[in-house]
């Protein structure tokens, strides 16, 4: 079951991850000065991850290579255009998420690899993943486990060779991960924005947080379409 590898690994490292990065975040936050869309529900698809999967296995002819080149160009232009349209506030959240998710991935590389290897032997739907993540986040309120979950889900996206299905997974999981606790953590790190109306601050920040998580997978998308 999916719960075996997620609960037995992510949850086991929650305290270590929280204790290891919260102080760093508080230290760096003191220097951080410059910083009605409805998402479609994903299909009930099954994921099977295999770290030995090589994209070269799918590029056997010249036509395959040319099509991949065209696909990469079009996708990259679209991603770049979407990124340029984001407001400064959202980009500041992207920077924060990138920095600390990368830190978690690097500092806990061995632990993450254990989870990735276990995931490579399992088949499960995106709803299985979402349910387990939701349970974990309800039981654990720390920032570390949320950053670890983003890093973990992003890596699963790298190992799934279907970009369309992976985007759907990111869409659903971004809503689940971006709960009130995560919004509070990120907004505490980020400098205040006086342009946000007080009456809708939380709703606005939650929407911005979801958008930021989606674009925090920017490098992953480039990896998949490259």
Curated annotation (Swiss-Prot):
Write down the species.
Vaccinia virus (strain Copenhagen)
Q: Which UniProt keywords apply?
A: Host cytoplasm, Host membrane, Host mitochondrion, Host mitochondrion outer membrane, Host-virus interaction, Inhibition of host apoptosis by viral BCL2-like protein, Membrane, Modulation of host cell apoptosis by virus
Q: What does this protein do?
A: Plays a role in evading host innate immune response by inhibiting host inflammasome activation. Interacts with and inhibits NLR-mediated interleukin-1 beta/IL1B production in infected cells. At the host mitochondria outer membrane, interacts with the BH3 domain of host BAK and prevents BAK from binding active BAX. In turn, host apoptosis is inhibited.
Please verify whether the record's keywords include Membrane.
yes
Protein name, UniProt field: Apoptosis regulator OPG045
Give the highest taxon in the source lineage.
Viruses
Q: How does it assemble?
A: Homodimer. Interacts with host pro-apoptotic protein BCL2L11 (via BH3 domain). Interacts with host NLRP1. Interacts with host BAK.
* Tagged with keyword Membrane: yes
Q: Which GO terms describe its biological process?
A: regulation of apoptotic process; symbiont-mediated suppression of host apoptosis
Q: What induces it?
A: Expressed in the early phase of the viral replicative cycle.
GO CC, any one term:
membrane
Gene3D superfamilies associated with the record: Blc2-like (1.10.437.10)
- Tell me the Pfam families matching this sequence: M11L
**Principal location:** host cell
Where would you find this protein in the cell?
A: Host mitochondrion outer membrane; Host cytoplasm
Q: Which family does the similarity line name?
A: Belongs to the orthopoxvirus OPG045 family.
